[in-house]
Amino acid sequence: MIARFLIAAAVIGSTAIRPLDAQSRPSAVFDWFEYTGHDSVFDKMRPGPNEFQNPILAGFYPDPSIVRRGDDYYLVNSSFSYFPGVPLFHSKDLVHWTQIGSVLTRPSQLQLDSAGVSRGIFAPVIREHAGTFYMITTIADRGNFVVTAKDPAGAWSDPVWLPEIADAIDPSLFFDDDGKAYVVNNGPPVGQPLYSGHRAIWVQQFDVAGMKLIGPRKVIVNGGVDISKKPIWIEAPHIFKHDGKYFLICAEGGTADQHSEVVFRADSPMGPYAPGPINPILTQRHLDPNRPFPITSTGHADFVETQNGEWWAVFLGVRPYGDNLYNTGRETWLLPVRWENGWPMILAGNATVPYVLQRPKLPAESAPKIAMSGNFAVRDDFASKTLAPYWEFVRTPRESFFDLMSHPGSLTLSARSAALGTRAQLSFVGRRQQHIDASASTAMRFTPTKPGEIAGLVAFQTDDFNYLLGVTLVNGKRSVQLIERDGRVPNKAPITVVTAPIPGAAGATVYLKITARGDKYDFSYATEPGQWTTLKADADGTILSSKVAGGFSSNFVGAMFGMYAYSP
């Protein structure tokens, strides 16, 4: 069933966003946008009574962090250079999640000017203490900060920067039961690194009242579980207390197919920490990559204890469609944590991450209006005065470029001079591709008035890797055109793949559709509803994968489908 909704996003503060003279530029009007995803694995592995389906957040929702207050659970993810930043979800059963907004909704909180798509916000962590919620995170190349809120669904504070850990990433907060607090983070090792990927985990006390770090800063893990094996990228640390002991969990191995989760234990938050007898406590790196419906790259976990005393882990994982290729990005998964001989274990031995398993022992919620797992379809008729919370922009907006009021029941985008292929803040409103087999379609009215003007649908991975299916002017005729950007070609020049004239009146509605089928994408158009003409079939979808679009060491995002408008 298609979900139709009137869910309002957090209002984006107008401070520092300039009004745009819409009369000076053409506009594209989108009457609706429909996303449909249908992966065969979700048909083959359907949850039964008292079961749930993984991933709990399908698509590009990596680096999950979770917290409980009472019987309410809140979860955040990395957003990199998309705005609003840090999507925020709520659940009461750990299975059904509803996005209630984003943490960083104002330009004063998040400045992403000219940032690469995989820079921006890394690994946010959400915690609650004494009635206040805290979100601590890294903004790549700029440092680390904390924001706070009494109500996580409400407005969050402006950032409080932590200059003491300017060289760090992945900070996490731990509030001890004696009233003290600590920040633990990834940072460079003491002295010169011994090998590529050599990192360390540091800890320092945090003054909650002063919102600053105090006291000595200390390395508690050097390299990883066993530095003699040259482990890489020990990161994403979190400290928990259980039965009087302090547990440190970290990701190790880099966020690709060698990813894992490891654990250490100490008698004090400041250490010393000893690795557990069985490490890693979660990985899939030793399994056959050609197994059916593989889940790989698992790690970057966070733990939560339910009100019933159960422990659960959220973590990232990916669903490749072949040869370590995936366009859906790193997704959020849920598994129980077992305590064995005083140590936590998520998944041992050759066990595979299950798509279906028994639900937590919590009162079941009804399915959310907008599904986040399994197969589903979502249609936005733009009937609300605000955008739904899952819509994203590329980088922080500095001028108004869209509205929902000038054409009620439609989304209007101003065709500005911010172009695909640059690090500009585009006239782009997009949502995640959440399935390997998916489609995005829209109905658009756009009348280009000069060569170069174009508006339509984009399949977007990065500035240098994307497809644009748009309406433009070619030899004085309104035409539909497919433009490919493959950053591997010389000068990263865009390629016009195919062009076709559009029959009918200049201002008539054009329907556009992008269909993903694993590594193949089809691009279609119509002038009447449902009467699709294929403009291009079997286009190379691997350019929208993390592996091709930069590689796993520099590309951390998934593909987006979105609406776009441009005028030179």
Regions found by a protein language model. Give the residues of each.
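Bacterial N-terminal signal peptides
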Residues: 4-16
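Sec/Tat signal peptide C-region and signal peptidase I cleavage site
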Residues: 18-21
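Carbohydrate-active catalytic/glycan-binding domains of CAZyme proteins
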Residues: 23-568
